[in-house]
Amino acid sequence: TNVRFHQEDTLRRIMDRVTSELGVVIERFRADCGSFSKEIIQTVEQRCNTFYIRAANCGSRCEDFRQLKEWKSVEVGYERCDVTSVSMDDFIEGKSYRLVVQRSPLKDKDGREQTDMFGVIYTYRCILTNNWTSTEKDIITFYNERGASEKNFDIQNNDFGWSHLPFSFMAENMVFMMVTAMLKNFYLYLIRNISEKVKPLKKTSRLKAFILHFVSVPAKWVRTGRQNVLNLYTN
């Protein structure tokens, strides 16, 4: 299913219920390029103060970026990149939005910048927003924080069984998800302490690495003395 399938009406229902039933004011909204459409942006803008949506690039837009001269060098995520802002007036009629553009040099496997006959080859990333006051670095940093939240779901899905829920009803599955979420917090505490004494493990090691060192034990059945003996390869 296309990521935009019923996304606009789903967002509209969720935001309306949050604001009307809970009395919550939605301050900021951020989403990836799957939400980059006129209908979704109009719905979001009406229901929150500021939004930050990854803009889809196209060939003509990248060519426009190459013509820009006023780039500022900043550090984002411990890496240097160039940033600038341009006004986007032709996306929705009567509306003017800010397009925050980030460019990073394309590098080969040895870390060397790639070039062509026109100079350094850049990778461009854009964020569409109605925030005209924050700096480009602040906007990019805030948008990138959504990746940390997605990683939490990746860990829960692959390490703690959320991708294969054990029950047929949501009530039971909700209990399972809450318990495994608490177990994940306990595991993070455990791995932080164990990693200080067990060298192969790190504070960021996933559950699979922990199982490999502490739970999984290689073994082999061997024939000796006219009987089968289970040989454990462990200390």
Which positions does each model-derived feature cover?
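Short, conserved catalytic/metal-binding motifs centered on acidic residues
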Residues: I26-G34, F51, I127, S149-Q156, ...
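Short amphipathic alpha-helical "interface-anchor" segments enriched in bulky aromatics
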Residues: E136-M170, V175, V179, L183-L188
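An anionic, glycine-rich sequence signature occurring as long contiguous blocks
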Residues: T50-N158
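Active-site beta-loop-alpha junctions of metal-dependent nucleic acid enzymes
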Residues: T1-S20
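Acidic, metal-coordinating catalytic cores used for nucleic-acid/nucleotide bond scission
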Residues: F29-S37, N57-S60
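A short acidic (Asp/Glu
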Residues: S37-T43, C62-R66
